[in-house]
Amino acid sequence: MSTTRPLLGMKRITEVTCTEPPGGRQSPTASRAQPDSLTVDEFTVHEDKQTELKCSKPKVEQVFQVTFTIIGLLDHTGAHGSKASRQIWLQLKGKKEDVYKAKEYVKGLCDPELQKEEWYPVDMHCIFAGARGLFLDRLLRDTSAEVQVLEPGRLKLSGCAEAVVMAQSRVQQFVALFQEKRSLPADREPSVKRKFKTFVEDRADKYAMELLLLPSALKEELLGLAQSPTQPIVIIDLEQDRSQTSTPVTDLSNRILDTTFEDKTSPITPEVMPGLNGRPCNKRRSSESEQRDTKRQYSLERREEEQCEEREREPTKTWTVKSAKGTLAASEMTNESEAVSPETNLRCLVNFFRTMGYQQDVVERVVRETGQTEDTFLLLERIVEETQKTQSTQGAQRTSRTPDPSPCANASSTSTSNRLKEKERVQMRALAEIKCKENIRPPSTNGIGQKNQTSSVPLASATLKRNNGAQTDLCEVIIIDDEEDFTETERKPRLTPLDLKPESRFDYLPRGSSQTMVPVRMETVTNLRSSSQGPPLRTSDTRPGCSYQTLPGRAPLPRSEAQYTSKAAPLTGMSRFQQSLRTPYRLILQNEPGSPNLRHIIIDGSNVAMAHGLHRVFSCRGIAIAVEAFWRRGHREITVFVPQWRQKKDPNITEQHFLNQLENLRLLSFTPSREVCGHRISSHDDRFLLHLAEKTGGVIVTNDNLRDFVSQSEAWRRIIHERLLQFTFVEDHFMIPDDPLGKHGPHLDEFLLKDSRGSPIIPPLRTDLRATPSVYSQAAQSTAHPSSPSHWPHSGPPDWHLPRPSPSPPPQRSPSETTELKRKLYDIFPDQKQRIDRILSDNPYMRDLNALSGLLLG
């Protein structure tokens, strides 16, 4: 290739044939087909984007499967120019289609033509964050637009105009499919569910369970998005490999056959394993350690193995196991298309759902009704419904049980195997209420079966485990408490002791998760030997062979309320405020004409935002709620004033995008502010409120009394007295009073009309007008009889706090006090000097400036 470059703004494409893709990796397709020709595209961008491109280089190469090289400046003659004017060379190398898409993405990244924000339900966040980011990468690749997850429920789309529109359309399509919850035709739905489940399990993360719960139509759309032309063969190979191994139920049955039905003394040789339909059965069976470390995330194999070991120790079931094994072998010899016999498959299904906490008779009935080939999720739904019906009929019997205070130390071992089986059935029914009410939640990443870590299957909220070391027929019951749903009404039935023997009954101490701040429901089983948390126990009452805590006695609630409250985080106003911010809010203003007779609304943005944020956080959502409230009332002349420095990023300012949205709608104005040597210089935003109210005759929405501006001018004084509208917030509800000027003033609808400006009505002063004759008569009597204490005028406008009546009047004002009051009143009311002199002479005892001002206004 030549080292020369074309002129700025031009590009040159050179096609080169290579034997393998960039990076030295060769896909399965390339190994079987003719290698594709690679394209080299070189173009220029502004130099000031170089840092951003260096950060995006790994992402571009990963998503678009190209080699991205930042060549830099080649023409150093223009090095004296600014970075905004100089340009650097970039090179993309790869397949022609990949290079074209990558170039569109880089161009949109450096010079975005369009930027948009798109909202989606929070429950869809797993699409953009799950599957190890594959869906998000494929969305970037298909649209060539930059898609950023700002927060759960909000995306930022930027890039070329066409790419942004395509990405927005794709996201809106996902949202529509999610909200419609539409299912696929019966012939396609099982196949789509199976493929999607395989796809998600191969890329399992903490969002896997949420992805599996998406609607079928959305699953099909996501599969189409994921099966891009980059790796079509790989996905097919993965699907074929999964289909050749087993389904979750048959895989579980194979594991049970290998671990339980065969003699533990006989080693498992590779020659025996390929017997099941010729399928590769060497997965997870090389050793016991490998089997422990490679458990599937969504199976209950550890607990299933415990149940199998429990059954294996019972001699009465030995011949049943062997006969089942023989039946299985016979079925395999006669029909290679079946992995296990129907009887074994039924037994495995029953055991599988029993480990999830459901009753055996309910599971057997549902499986026989629906058939063994039914989808696992549909079986689970039917089992949950049947369990709830059964529990509703047996609830009265469970709540009527009372514990027996007999100690466990003197328990005898006289119960037989049949009696133990019956007791196990009673225990499962007693725990079924807890188990059947649990919802399917996303699993934690800590794994399954680890006793000191959180369980990843919330449905299995209680596990019955046999004590191997004890000589009696006692069983340990481990109750896993979910503190989130633990209410006062549920404590007694959930902690009712289980009757294990005629003479021994126990109360079991639930140990819940100590991670109370985590929003996801967590359940833990805490080992007594490795944990020191929880209330102290009486060691003399604890069994030596028991690994978990038990408390003897009748009390159904071993832990006190104080211990529960000490674990929970304290409830504060800020915690509730932060919780309310998780609920998405969108500012929606209908594009329809309003009422022309309504006054201009002038909102004190700082006052409203701080009121919504509990006077600790500047909540921009409060401003948006206030604007929407007045918009719904028909106001179209709305102005919000906010200081300009509130545009800066600050942890105490929430949801600043509402400010930009209102500014774009010309409903918000920023008052000027600047910084000089680190000091902020801001104009008083209240002055802007008063100036605009004076110019437009509008109403100021604020809880500030604006007392500092009463003496500025007569017009401002009348605005402060007549046109202030107060408000309050009840969570996210903006409320204003129906009587903004008091109970004797005009109604809110009349107060907000433009016509009321000509003859303003001040309710407190109207009340005073009725009392004015008595006030003046009392003042006249006081001047005629100054020594009479009963005629001293102590009444005035009801909104002012006047001195309390006293047995003797205070002394009259001195001449200096009268002169000072006269000067202040002249400043406030410059056009009423004669009336000021008359009122001062009629009220020689009055020193309250506010009371004198009220008399002047009356």
From Swiss-Prot:
CDD domains: KH-I_N4BP1, KH-I_N4BP1_like_rpt1, PIN_N4BP1-like. Its main location: nucleus. Keywords: Hydrolase, Immunity, Innate immunity, Nuclease, Nucleus, RNA-binding. It is found in: Nucleus; Nucleus, Nucleolus; Nucleus, PML body. Residues 285-316 have a biased composition (Basic and acidic residues). Residues 785-799 have a biased composition (Low complexity). Gene3D superfamilies: 3.40.50.11980. It holds the Pfam family RNase_Zc3h12a. Residues 598-750 form the RNase NYN domain. GO terms for molecular function: mRNA binding; RNA nuclease activity; ubiquitin binding. The keyword Cytoplasm does not apply. GO terms for cellular component: cytosol; nucleolus; nucleus; PML body. GO terms for biological process: innate immune response; negative regulation of cytokine production; negative regulation of proteasomal ubiquitin-dependent protein catabolic process; negative regulation of protein ubiquitination; negative regulation of viral genome replication; regulation of innate immune response. Residues 17-37, 262-321, 388-424, 774-823 are annotated as: Disordered. Potent suppressor of cytokine production that acts as a regulator of innate immune signaling and inflammation. Acts as a key negative regulator of select cytokine and chemokine responses elicited by TRIF-independent Toll-like receptors (TLRs), thereby limiting inflammatory cytokine responses to minor insults. Has ribonuclease activity. PANTHER family: N4BP1-RELATED (PTHR12876), NEDD4-BINDING PROTEIN 1 (PTHR12876:SF26). Belongs to the N4BP1 family. This is NEDD4-binding protein 1. It comes from Danio rerio. The lineage of its organism: Eukaryota, Metazoa, Chordata, Craniata, Vertebrata.
